[in-house]
From Swiss-Prot:
Gene Ontology cellular component terms for the protein in this record: cytosol
Protein name: S-adenosylmethionine decarboxylase proenzyme
Posttranslational modification: Is synthesized initially as an inactive proenzyme. Formation of the active enzyme involves a self-maturation process in which the active site pyruvoyl group is generated from an internal serine residue via an autocatalytic post-translational modification. Two non-identical subunits are generated from the proenzyme in this reaction, and the pyruvate is formed at the N-terminus of the alpha chain, which is derived from the carboxyl end of the proenzyme.
Catalytic residues identified in the record: S112 (schiff-base intermediate with substrate), H117 (proton acceptor), C140 (proton donor)
Classification via InterPro entries: AdoMetDC_fam_prok, S-AdoMet_deCO2ase_bac, S-AdoMet_deCO2ase_core
Organism: Yersinia pseudotuberculosis serotype I (strain IP32953)
Pfam families: AdoMet_dc
Amino acid sequence: MSKLKLHGFNNLTKSLSFCIYDICYAKTADDRDGYIAYIDEQYNANRLTEILSETCSIIGANILNIARQDYDPQGASVTILVSEEPVDPRDVDTSEHPGPLPSAVVAHLDKSHICVHTYPESHPEAGLCTFRADIEVSTCGVISPLKALNYLIHQLESDIVTMDYRVRGFTRDINGVKHFIDHKINSIQNFMSDDMKSLYHMMDVNVYQENIFHTKMMLKDFDLKHYLFNAKPEELSAEEKEQITCLLYKEMQEIYYGRNVPEV
């Protein structure tokens, strides 16, 4: 897409939101309480603030204000307002490719906010526990928040990820013509690194005419030891391992596809 000469400021709003899920099996009620306490501490407001602040550092944004809160009995929220940076549109790379990691060069972010909310929960009987983090990066200007995607998914290792990217509003060129998107995109996947894509099953549901893009991700490899809380596979019988594996797989399938799977 050729560079546009705009009349005034770029008024397009670009929003990236995604949910990450961590799945775990905790056998007893005490273990389930222990998992929720553990994950609640791992992703408390201070830790989330560190992650989002590092995100701002990577993309070259200045933090104006931070609002954070831990909740009782569990969960946390952090919202960061970011200052507007003057950006020359000619210097902005709008091509489809993975965004930066902490060791890479930074990109500038215009008016924006970054927020995260966490939701730990557990099944009342089956031993299944899930942790969900909702993250949103929203910008107003020439930069796409997709540039922050690669870092955030690397930082928040997860079993399942669902992502939505949308562009809203319009901006005018010097001839008064409205433009409803200012960069090429056919999939969120194009903004992820190859090593990340190799780890996940992926599925797209895109509505191109509405500038809405949706991608789901689920880990390909399943290793039971990574899903047990306060237990080891060698401590379980073959029957228990098979039962727990089936429970976890069903839980992941239901979250990935967004519907309950009937018993067979």
